[in-house]
Amino acid sequence: MKEKLEAALSETKLQEYKLTEENGQLSIYAKGVPAHASTPTVGVNAAGVTFACLEKAGFEDDFVKFYNTHIGTSCDGAGIGLKFADEYGDLTLCNGIIKTENGVVSCTIDIRVPVTLKADEVRKMCADRLEDENGRMEILEIGDPLFFPRESPLVNALYKAYTDVTGDTENKPMVIGGGTYAKSLKNIIAFGPEKPGIDYRIHSADEFILVSGMEEAVLVYMEAIKNLLAI
């Protein structure tokens, strides 16, 4: 078992793993690759990879089989019936924490929903899901999307500030799956300094921004404030 698991783990993209056997018990340490919950495909989920390797190594366990069938290493929610996409992007699923308490195994999952899929529709998609397999889905929190159409005066004002300062007219305004404090107020847009072609290692070790990028962002923000005041 240990040798087969070692072989399976060696073929993965885990940053690090270690198997320790003591008193007849096998402990597994696995280190994945962190990523923002809205872009889980960029990272490597240590739990998902480990469960997949356990099954590949011949470990028989009801939960491992259940997890691999319904969640696994996929990030599209298809295994639990939540796969969805619209013109603005795909639904993403990111498993965060798995724990055992009082004989019950639970997974805390972060799902980022495309803007056209409403909260009530998500609730219907989750209702009674998995109960015929001794499982249950519970929505702990669900928020309304923050969205402004491309022709919105707010979007136009911010985009003009960006193009006037940077000269970049090739890259257009886009939506992201990240949650922001802009949701706390009405008529607010999250407007950040991330530029195409640079991996800022967001929510990972060594997250950074270039000094030149920060200086340019200040100029963009100055123009943005002037444009917003003119609306």
Model-derived features: where do they sit?
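Intrinsic-disorder/low-complexity loop/linker signature
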Residues: 24, 102-103
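An extended, acidic, His-containing surface patch that forms the Zn2+-binding/catalytic region
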Residues: 34, 38-102, 108, 112, ...
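Fold-level recognition of mixed alpha/beta catalytic cores in primary-metabolism enzymes, strongest
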Residues: 1-48, 208-210, 216
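Short amphipathic alpha-helix segments
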Residues: 1-16, 73-90, 120-130
